[in-house]
Amino acid sequence: MGKNREMRLTHICCCCLLYQLGFLSNGIVSELQFAPDREEWEVVFPALWRREPVDPAGGSGGSADPGWVRGVGGGGSARAQAAGSSREVRSVAPVPLEEPVEGRSESRLRPPPPSEGEEDEELESQELPRGSSGAAALSPGAPASWQPPPPPQPPPSPPPAQHAEPDGDEVLLRIPAFSRDLYLLLRRDGRFLAPRFAVEQRPNPGPGPTGAASAPQPPAPPDAGCFYTGAVLRHPGSLASFSTCGGGLMGFIQLNEDFIFIEPLNDTMAITGHPHRVYRQKRSMEEKVTEKSALHSHYCGIISDKGRPRSRKIAESGRGKRYSYKLPQEYNIETVVVADPAMVSYHGADAARRFILTILNMVFNLFQHKSLSVQVNLRVIKLILLHETPPELYIGHHGEKMLESFCKWQHEEFGKKNDIHLEMSTNWGEDMTSVDAAILITRKDFCVHKDEPCDTVGIAYLSGMCSEKRKCIIAEDNGLNLAFTIAHEMGHNMGINHDNDHPSCADGLHIMSGEWIKGQNLGDVSWSRCSKEDLERFLRSKASNCLLQTNPQSVNSVMVPSKLPGMTYTADEQCQILFGPLASFCQEMQHVICTGLWCKVEGEKECRTKLDPPMDGTDCDLGKWCKAGECTSRTSAPEHLAGEWSLWSPCSRTCSAGISSRERKCPGLDSEARDCNGPRKQYRICENPPCPAGLPGFRDWQCQAYSVRTSSPKHILQWQAVLDEEKPCALFCSPVGKEQPILLSEKVMDGTSCGYQGLDICANGRCQKVGCDGLLGSLAREDHCGVCNGNGKSCKIIKGDFNHTRGAGYVEVLVIPAGARRIKVVEEKPAHSYLALRDAGKQSINSDWKIEHSGAFNLAGTTVHYVRRGLWEKISAKGPTTAPLHLLVLLFQDQNYGLHYEYTIPSDPLPENQSSKAPEPLFMWTHTSWEDCDATCGGGERKTTVSCTKIMSKNISIVDNEKCKYLTKPEPQIRKCNEQPCQTRWMMTEWTPCSRTCGKGMQSRQVACTQQLSNGTLIRARERDCIGPKPASAQRCEGQDCMTVWEAGVWSECSVKCGKGIRHRTVRCTNPRKKCVLSTRPREAEDCEDYSKCYVWRMGDWSKCSITCGKGMQSRVIQCMHKITGRHGNECFSSEKPAAYRPCHLQPCNEKINVNTITSPRLAALTFKCLGDQWPVYCRVIREKNLCQDMRWYQRCCETCRDFYAQKLQQKS
């Protein structure tokens, strides 16, 4: 098995892609790319990620910060920037599979081996190393020279613990993994390590960095600075936990239903880089927990009290009991972790230490999940690495026996104030509490009740924590999944049962699920409601008292920064993270900055977006910032009481109708809607000015924005919206010109219309009914006349059919008059014809032989929706129209199956004595748009345009300012813009003419270093201020006048004789020196047309021979036809006309046939004219049954029977 896998790995490595991982100067990872559409990936992190001490001066120092992490604003951390040169990729030998350990017969089954096409890959990349200063920044384009790094030195002793500035403990990491960009905001977090944490090796191999920490006053945790915790930005509920100890990156990301793992490979040949393995496990709810799959004890062993087996199901009746006192908010589990000799030997002592601490950091974060409602902190006091198995400790296949032995051993070691107590009592005092939990990590494949290997990965005593001889856990090393195993087993040790034991929680996939422990069907990192109640039941019991007896010094003082990320990274810097260093925030979209971050890349005219809002804390207005996609005040709003509504949120759109919402906090533990006595969230319609003409529809805009998000840089794939009637509030998009709808998002943005017609609007992914009165949830509806709550009697319906079947070109169907509503034109069947529509102006659909794609068009004052799916078409418009519309059909030679149209027009006008009073319009001044910035750099201003608007019947339009002359016009709003400093650059004039008109000469130009002022004026600057070398001011040239001209030959005949083709000619330079001017070279080929030989003779098939025996004749049809149109003509050459007749020779006629026994074919042909078989289905059977002799059958199958007689004659002859 190992050899086969190794061969596959070697093959895969030869075709893998490897990309550069780099950093911006502010510590943000700018590029970390993976090969697309793979469940398992490999990436090589550059040498800049190696953890090397760096002093503030740039040389080697004593900082414990990993070299690849730079805290924003922190001191003492290295600055690293990606090298811009190309990289060489080569394959290397793969890491061999795990060897059997102590009689183990096969490799581990958890996690399962990768399937076909998902094998591990190992690559090594040559990186540009650091300069002499250790971790100095490498600028793009630096020389690709390097020296091998010096031999590894033992890390120096860490400095005393210091309180780092909050800004220096966070880093923003960008990972474009699995076809999407993930932005991780990580904070340094070593809270799981106690200040007196120590690592001990038994027996002690001697002094070294991992030797026993026996000093009476050990320093701060030596590994606390290389652990990071955080989440994925804009993904609430996500979790990220990583370690950078040792120079690599190890940990996991939980995002929705995916678990993404990153771990370094053991590649000692990688001198300048660290190969890493990146893979994911996706949650699958397809595996229902059946009776077979519910046997989770196969993977997890739970030992209850001695001699008393634990019940498989937990009674539900006692779970509703509430206790009168409130639980404390924080519990601490002071833990000792032991690694068995097989674990230490497999990884190596130093690597085992880093790996185990990484796992424990992940376990710490699993217990921090808010679903527990109680804070449970893992505090690691000591890590013991066993190089030899103690005589009194049993490590073997029998899991229950091993657990019992380990509990007894740890009690002897830590249960009596000898060892760890004696080391720490000097500083902690004699009242120090005992160890709360002990964990043994082993490489031994064990089984619960059998002395043989099996699939069990963890075993623990149920509710054994704090008990002297039952506070034990054993977990098998199965990679990064070990963190989930330890968290799961610690849950058992704190009295938490499997979710499968609770009928109400058996269907979920949480940490305590029986499926979860396998590591094959991970759910999420939350704890179920049943686990929460089991834990609360344990914490309320006296068995949990030790978790409250925590020494204050064991609480790590690392503080999580409270600063929002948008306060650290401006909008311009966030754009640089998304689109590169030449990007900046698009000032034109300042008014909608919180709904989506729009960026402009230098050199491009249009703004880009990825539809994601900016980071929380980004400035959006004076005294306001963005939070959760909304522009809110920086001053925190007072918390409202339970059940009290919050303020209405800003409108989801800036033009046209949108959605606004408000929420309220609900009483109860779960804050569910049922505790609110009504909905927890309410929505309402908010009106805005109409969107400017010419902009794409809101749904199309979302698709177009997504096209920038997913397209490759070389080929921008444009998308257009496709409406799915079953899921109107999901975003389906199709490439322009193709009918291939793809679901790009489960939810469209709030305020998107549910369809092309109607008022219904999408809110939170659901279509909300909107009445014609503009109220959400209203039952008011327009009648087909367009009257809200009307009776349908104010208009009449005009409908009809158009059945013009054949023709070519545009044919007018009808003219739809002005004032029409509810226009609908539908093809009866798919056809090759095209519907066309045109108003009195220049607006049209499918006119002038130009066929449009599906979309919305503005014609005659209304929005017309055109839909084409294959050959079927539909046109619809709500109206009313302000001008007549001409409906046409573009016909071809194919069949047109007709179309149906209908619309409504107002009924007869009111009598003269009646009048309909028109509603009075409302005029007001509004800020409609922003002017351009008055400076391109150096700081400028931009103002709003104040326009007079007319509001009438909920329609808003811009009118002449005279309408608002009696109103006070507000001052325009002013904002600063383009505050970036103006750059210096070289400016050159045009080259002067060559000094000689023929032959070699010189030409010159003026070169100066210039700088642009804020008003656009260019001034001369010092040459040393310009970047790059000074361009040349003189160059050699050669006069062109003495050069001879090109000589062109005669055009050849056209390449085709019927249609468009190409003709050629020869062009040569007559100058002996061959220095003719290429720009004046005549063309050698051009298009041509020749229709001289379009008519050709077309021949039909030869007919059958005129007789059945002897000599006869055959004929065929000869026609003169046009090659392209297929029309008949008389322009074919008669000399080239093929023959229409030819003789045919069959076998000689046999005159010996007895005419009394068989009907002669000639006689039959004379008496009956054969027009073909009348029963073609049965004629073959009649022939086989020899019924052709009967004249009755012959008449019905004369054609088949002729051949029958011919065979008979041939056989007898």
Swiss-Prot record:
Q: Which residues form the TSP type-1 domain?
A: 640-692, 921-981, 982-1043, 1045-1089, 1093-1150
Report residue spans for region: Disordered.
49-161, 192-215
Start-end of Gly residues biased regions = 52-71
Q: List the disulfide bonds.
A: C407-C472, C447-C454, C466-C546, C505-C530, C575-C599, C586-C607, C594-C626, C620-C631, C651-C686, C655-C691, C666-C676, C994-C1037, C998-C1042, C1009-C1026
What broad class describes the main subcellular location of this protein?
Answer: secreted
Segments of this protein annotated with the region Spacer = 797-920
What ranges does the record list as Acidic residues composition bias? 110-119
Q: Which residues are glycosylated?
A: N266, N803, N913, N955, N1015
The record's comment on cofactor binding reads: Binds 1 zinc ion per subunit.
**Annotated Peptidase M12B domain residues:** 331-551
Q: Could you say which residues form the signal peptide?
A: 1-27
Q: What processes does the entry annotate via GO biological process terms?
A: aortic valve morphogenesis; collagen fibril organization; extracellular matrix organization; mitral valve morphogenesis; proteolysis; pulmonary valve morphogenesis; tricuspid valve morphogenesis; ventricular septum morphogenesis
Which residues lie in the propeptide?
Answer: 28-322
Domain PLAC span(s) in chain numbering: 1166-1205
The family database entries (InterPro entries) matched by this protein are listed as: ADAM_Cys-rich (IPR006586), ADAMTS/ADAMTS-like (IPR013273), ADAMTS17/19_C (IPR056270), ADAMTS_ADAMTS-like (IPR050439), ADAMTS_CR_2 (IPR041645), ADAMTS_spacer1 (IPR010294), MetalloPept_cat_dom_sf (IPR024079), Peptidase_M12B (IPR001590)
Q: What is the effect of changing L366I?
A: In a breast cancer sample; somatic mutation
Query: What is the disorder linked to it?
Result: Cardiac valvular dysplasia 2: An autosomal recessive form of congenital heart defects, characterized primarily by congenital stenosis and insufficiency of the semilunar valves, although mild insufficiency of the atrioventricular valves has been observed as well. Other features include subaortic stenosis and dilation of the ascending aorta and/or pulmonary artery in some patients.
Name of the protein: A disintegrin and metalloproteinase with thrombospondin motifs 19
List the source organism: Homo sapiens (Human)
Q: Which gene encodes it?
A: ADAMTS19
